[in-house]
């Protein structure tokens, strides 16, 4: 008798896929709420734009391929791709950026490979990286969290800035990015990297308003804790497994601690790494993508650890302040190799 060995994914039950995607969308609510609270209504506008763009792009491709549009859209994967991209970009980024990134993610990074289950790279992170490389200024223009912001635009102002670049009173991104010290604010990771390169001491950097949080950066620590809460709920629901988040966070914390102990004057402390940027979003919502992550338990541990190491290396020595998106995509490349060497041994066969 001959058995055919198929490549992953080994199961593709649409109802099960739809349920898992829905659970992930629900788990994202705390993180979305935190970003709305600290950065204003722009996040919600970006989510709406990305969701509509993702659904339309997927429907268009399915129509061209003469596949069932309604049945495929019900798996909620397009919505999740749009959501992950929307919460990763600055809340007041121009409308066309999130549309461009989402369409690229769905059509090029997902459907071009054959659709859900066939794409080797995380589509949302492909879209994010394309935008970051193409439009670095806009993609790094985050607002200061409301704790240290001079102005937080309301819902109408957020819409006007996203679609026209100005508020009703004539304010632009330069004025909206001002902090309480009158200086344009960046993210904690971006501020740290820029200030170290400018020759500032870590002691000086930690006095900046952006680091006024209890544990890490103002606002960002609570956003990360909110994503952590959603991620723990996913674990409780058994929608994801613990291997990737744990190995990712442990490796990132270990590397950050060792680096900080050996070079405290140039490298960020571990709590800055763990509670800033897209750390918790990446650990629980992006790296755990069942299509692009390793499929064995040992492989998941290696995959998560590799991503954690890459995030620390990029943040500490690379040209970009965060690095989660690049780390995810680089780790995605290694998945076939990891799965090959960590696949379970067939019972009755000798090792090797």
UniProtKB/Swiss-Prot annotation:
Keyword Nucleus listed: no
Highest taxon in the source lineage: Bacteria
Residue numbers bearing the FMN phosphoryl threonine modification: 187
EC supergroup of this enzyme: translocase
BP GO annotations: electron transport chain; transmembrane transport
Membrane-topology descriptor: Multi-pass membrane protein
This protein's UniProt keywords: Cell inner membrane, Cell membrane, Electron transport, Flavoprotein, FMN, Membrane, Phosphoprotein, Translocase, Transmembrane, Transmembrane helix, Transport
Localisation: Cell inner membrane
One GO CC annotation: plasma membrane
Subunit structure as annotated in this protein's UniProt entry: The complex is composed of six subunits: RsxA, RsxB, RsxC, RsxD, RsxE and RsxG.
Family: Belongs to the NqrB/RnfD family.
Entry-linked NCBIfam families: PRK00816.1 (NF002011), rnfD (TIGR01946)
The protein, known as: Ion-translocating oxidoreductase complex subunit D
Organism of origin: Escherichia coli (strain 55989 / EAEC)
Organism ancestry: Bacteria, Pseudomonadati, Pseudomonadota, Gammaproteobacteria, Enterobacterales
